[in-house]
């Protein structure tokens, strides 16, 4: 035992002596190497500062289908807006000597039973269909966000009463709203938008309410309340702003559904009256000739399908781009 203790003490003494030697080494300038300018930032972690929108756009661009859908929608919108510049034909100009003409250089999609250019009518119809879709979606967005945010933030009996009203309205089929409104107010642009809005805002209200109820218990919301922020400021500046991701995605899904509702009304014969034409009314006009002139039905239905597909691709891309969990 005594030998073991003695050996341990010797080892400790040697280690202390080595440490003292290291500490007593004199440092001179020749022992150091001057760092070059090229190596000064070698250990610096450099990254580009990006805003939330820029970061979301970079992720959105990586989704090829979403980017294709956006390009298609832009081309369709430009064509619908500037069709009078691109073509000398009008949507109601008739030429009875050139009815049911096939696709050609003069008439790319052919002509209808009155000799009207089908492509021009589809472009003019796209004006109405896209205008109805985006207008109804924007109004539904405003109503649904306001209603759902108030219900979610108020809570208690206010929330219960407001959401029971939504449940009661939600139990009625959407098409019944549309048919009732168009029958009462007439088949015009305004009545179709009102009918779509009445049937579309409730889903948005439910989603916003769920988001607000979750966010109002978060630390940043409670901190704003403790610091004396008003309820209006908390609701607008903190809760709704932090819910914009799901809101934008829902809005992108509202647009194709609104276009579909308008097209359904037109196909049922209770849409816009002639000579105005949307994609749905164009398909309805050609329905009687589906056996003899199938292309007359194919073109407007193809425009509806491609536009809705593009909008759904955009919605999926926005959902991935705005989701913080997928960064």
Where are these regions (language model features)?
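Gly/Trp-centered helix-boundary motif
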Residues: 14-145, 149, 156-157, 258, ...
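Short alpha-helical transmembrane interface motifs in multi-pass membrane proteins
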Residues: 38-39, 128-132, 147, 159-163, ...
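Transmembrane alpha-helix boundary and packing residues in multipass membrane permease domains
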Residues: 76, 149, 178-183, 192, ...
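Glycine-rich helix-loop "coupling/hinge" segments at transmembrane-helix boundaries
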Residues: 181-185, 196, 211-212, 260-303, ...
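Single conserved hydrophobic/aromatic residue that forms the stacking wall/gate
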Residues: 1-13
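Loop-to-transmembrane-helix entry motif
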Residues: 63-67, 122-125, 129-133, 165, ...
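Amphipathic cytosolic juxtamembrane alpha-helices at the membrane-cytosol interface
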Residues: 116-131, 135, 155-163, 213, ...
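Generic hydrophobic transmembrane alpha-helix motif, especially the helices
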Residues: 108, 112, 118, 142-144, ...
């Amino acid at each position: 035992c005594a030998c073991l203790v003695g050996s341990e003490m010797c080892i400790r003494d040697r280690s202390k002596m080595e440490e003292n030697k290291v500490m007593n080494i004199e440092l001179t300038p020749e022992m150091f190497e001057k760092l070059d300018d090229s190596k000064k930032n070698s250990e610096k972690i450099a990254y580009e500062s990006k805003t939330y929108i820029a970061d979301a756009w970079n992720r959105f661009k990586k989704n090829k289908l979403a980017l294709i859908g956006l390009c298609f929608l832009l081309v369709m919108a430009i064509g619908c807006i500037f069709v009078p510049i691109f073509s000398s034909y009008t949507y109601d100009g008739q030429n009875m000597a050139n009815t049911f003409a096939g696709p050609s250089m003069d008439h790319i999609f052919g002509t209808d039973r009155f000799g009207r250019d089908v492509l021009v009518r589809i472009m003019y119809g796209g004006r109405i269909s896209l205008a109805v879709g985006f207008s109804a979606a924007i109004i539904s967005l405003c109503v649904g966000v306001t209603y759902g945010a108030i219900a979610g933030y108020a809570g208690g009996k206010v929330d219960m009463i407001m959401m029971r009203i939504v449940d009661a309205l939600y139990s009625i089929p959407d098409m019944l709203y549309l048919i009732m409104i168009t029958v009462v107010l007439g088949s015009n642009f305004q009545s179709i938008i009102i009918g779509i809005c009445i049937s579309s805002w409730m889903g948005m209200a439910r989603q916003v309410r769920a988001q607000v109820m979750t966010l109002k218990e978060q630390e940043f919301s409670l901190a704003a309340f403790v610091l004396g922020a008003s309820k209006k400021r908390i609701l607008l500046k903190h809760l709704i702003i932090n819910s914009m991701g799901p809101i934008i995605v829902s809005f992108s899904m509202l647009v194709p559904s609104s276009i579909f509702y308008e097209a359904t009304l037109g196909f049922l014969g209770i849409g816009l009256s002639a000579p105005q034409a949307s994609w749905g009314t164009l398909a309805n006009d050609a329905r009687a000739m589906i056996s003899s002139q199938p292309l007359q039905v194919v073109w407007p239905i193809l425009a509806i399908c491609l536009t809705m597909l593009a909008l759904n691709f955009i919605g999926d891309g926005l959902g991935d781009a705005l989701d913080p969990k997928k960064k």
